[in-house]
Amino acid sequence: SAASDVYKRQVYATQDGTFSAVLFDGPYKLVTKDKNGPWVNNRDTIYVEVKGKTQCEVKVTPYFTISDENITLDNNIVSGTCNIQQIVQDAKISQAMLLVSKTTFVDENTNIARQNLSNINPGVTNISLDITSNQNVQSAKALFARIGVKANGADQAVYSEIFRLK
């Protein structure tokens, strides 16, 4: 179809990587953002023909993944452990972070407490954070935490599942 027949609309991925949009039937062009995300940069254009409920997958290759994660709260110490797997052979870890928030929306930019680790390698990683003197954390009715891992050169981290601490 001609370029003028293609509809344009911005769509944003959620924290779990999914995205959705309510669209009319017709041709669409999905253009990924350049140098965005915790994965190998691969600017791409995907043409999608929407007819009713339509699914579209955008495949990416993360620099790292996180597995076997666990986060606990005991005596004002938040302790996290995970296994960081290296997916891209020459990727290096910029930092790992333990992030705490009052809501399930917790990431590098949205948190009320954090502990960063640098100079780490893939494999089992332990990270802890003393929240004794953090009034924001102490006064929170609910606490959630997750671990993030950011690769050198990436603008975002890859994240673990979210754990409810209280």
Spans of model-derived segments:
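A glycine-anchored, Pro-Gly-centered beta-turn/N-cap motif
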Residues: F24-P27, G123, K141
